[in-house]
């Protein structure tokens, strides 16, 4: 049997980078090649290859800039294999902003390299569909009907997917359950606080989360209201642009950033709250999109980002309501990469969980290591994502936890896929969902 592979074409040749944003010397010159990033890097830990480590990728970025390495298939493969989890930034003693480097390299790839057909089309589908609310809602409704009919469950239980490929089965297992009514129906609403107004906040609802995590968004709004927040859900908000930033599609990311800055900034809000670590991380870094492009929006982006808060960060910083009912369960917590590494928020979720009576909390070994979700990484780099998920679930098994907690929707999907393959029943929840349950238990026992 002859295997036919479609080869991608390098369009810049061996002469360095093409037009557009490039990785800057200011950032990669900080690397002292000490190698402390290696053991922090999930792909290096799995493969043991220097070129799939942060240090190795920085070396390749420099070689392309100097014209010693073409912007071709090999370079793209190693840059694409990066999760952009930024664990290397936590480990780095020199303060290398690796995320900026790899995203700039991907901007060059996006502009100057033609990917193979299937990979290009899959990426294009995500990048074009997710920011389009109308198309996303239509697709969500179709998926909801498909899931509600029982057809999806039959397909998953049958062996039909395995006839195509194991990877297809893995990707289908990641598909989120649509939750009606969609949270998009609440866009534009104002939710009054329980008791006196302490803060006036705007809630960032996300894009996929509006369809697949409506209950999580509802729980977030309830918890904020319980803690004295008047919660406004701006109707004009849109996708945060994280997928586009991480893929180097920076022009589109700037458009999406401007949409959110306009929707939130002039509303007189104290804070902009999100329950998605990936969204919060990129929104806090909106100024980076405009620092060389648009001075007016750079200043507005700085003001916007200064008010962005993860919901766990916000609650831990205020005198949050500790009147929780008891949740008698053993729980563990997985640090989302873009909360723990990109935003350096680790203690806040644990502080909130420690306040719930009856909860037995067990630390997860290597909780800082990526679960393999990483935006759409688990779709476009499924083999590596599956390896990381397998390792993560082994660590979860060691805890004996019946509750797996995290603080990012993408991680929820990945971890739920891991749980679905196990014979042991576990729940996977966002931290704020457990807080909401604990408040509800307290109300029932009054």
Question: Regions from the language model: what does each represent?
Answer:
Residues 2-20, 44-77, 95-125, 424-434:
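Non-heme iron-sulfur electron-transfer modules
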Residues 16-28, 68-79, 192, 225-228, ...:
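Short, intrinsically disordered, charge-biased short linear motifs at domain edges
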Residues 24-44, 72, 76-96, 338, ...:
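Cysteine-centered iron-sulfur cluster-binding motifs in ferredoxin-type domains/subunits
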Residues 29, 48-52, 70, 244-251:
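Alpha-helix capping and helix-loop boundary segments enriched in small/acidic/polar residues
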Residues 36-39, 49-54, 230-233:
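N-terminal glycine-rich anion-binding loops that anchor highly charged ligand groups
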Residues 36-39, 59, 77, 144, ...:
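Generic structural signal for well-ordered, non-membrane alpha-helices
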Residues 98-446:
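Iron-sulfur cluster-binding electron-transfer modules in prokaryotic oxidoreductases
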């Amino acid at each position: 049997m002859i295997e036919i592979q479609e080869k991608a074409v390098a369009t810049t040749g061996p002469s360095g980078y093409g037009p557009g944003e490039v990785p800057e010397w200011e950032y990669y010159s900080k690397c002292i090649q000490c190698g402390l990033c290696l053991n922090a890097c999930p792909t290096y830990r799995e493969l043991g290859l220097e070129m799939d480590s942060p240090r190795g990728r920085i070396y390749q970025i420099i070689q392309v800039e100097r014209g010693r390495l073409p912007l071709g298939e090999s370079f793209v493969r190693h840059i694409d294999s990066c999760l952009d989890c930024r664990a290397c930034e936590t480990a780095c003693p020199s303060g290398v902003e690796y995320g900026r480097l790899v995203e700039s390299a991907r901007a060059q790839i996006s502009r100057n390299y033609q990917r193979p057909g299937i990979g290009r089309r899959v990426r294009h589908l995500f990048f074009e569909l997710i920011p389009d609310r109308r198309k996303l809602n239509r697709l969500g409704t179709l998926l909801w009907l498909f899931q509600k009919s029982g057809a999806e469950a039959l397909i998953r239980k049958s062996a039909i997917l395995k006839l195509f490929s194991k990877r297809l089965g893995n990707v289908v297992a990641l598909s989120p359950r649509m939750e009606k009514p969609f949270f998009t129906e609440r866009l534009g609403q104002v939710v009054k606080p329980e008791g006196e107004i302490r803060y006036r906040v705007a809630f960032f609802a996300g894009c996929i989360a509006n369809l697949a995590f409506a209950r999580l968004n509802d729980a977030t709004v309830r918890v904020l209201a319980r803690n004295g927040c008047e919660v406004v859900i701006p109707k004009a908000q849109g996708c945060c642009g994280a997928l586009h930033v991480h893929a180097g599609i920076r022009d589109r990311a700037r458009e999406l950033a401007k949409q959110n800055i306009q929707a939130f900034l002039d509303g007189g809000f104290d804070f902009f709250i999100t329950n998605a670590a990936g969204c919060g991380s990129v929104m806090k870094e909106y100024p980076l999109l405009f620092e060389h492009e648009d001075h007016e929006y750079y200043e507005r982006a700085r003001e916007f980002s200064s008010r962005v808060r993860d919901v766990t960060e916000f609650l831990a910083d205020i005198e949050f309501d500790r009147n929780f009912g008891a949740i008698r369960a053993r729980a563990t917590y997985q640090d989302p990469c873009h909360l723990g590494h990109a935003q350096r928020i680790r203690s806040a979720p644990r502080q909130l969980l420690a306040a719930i009576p009856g909860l037995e909390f067990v630390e997860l070994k290597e909780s800082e290591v990526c679960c393999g979700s990483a935006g759409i990484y688990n779709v476009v780099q499924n083999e590596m994502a599956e390896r990381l998920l397998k390792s993560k679930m082994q660590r979860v098994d060691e805890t004996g936890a019946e509750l797996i907690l995290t603080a990012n929707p993408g991680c929820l999907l990945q971890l739920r896929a891991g749980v679905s393959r196990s014979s042991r029943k576990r729940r996977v929840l966002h931290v704020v969902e457990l807080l909401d349950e604990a408040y509800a238990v307290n109300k029932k026992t009054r």
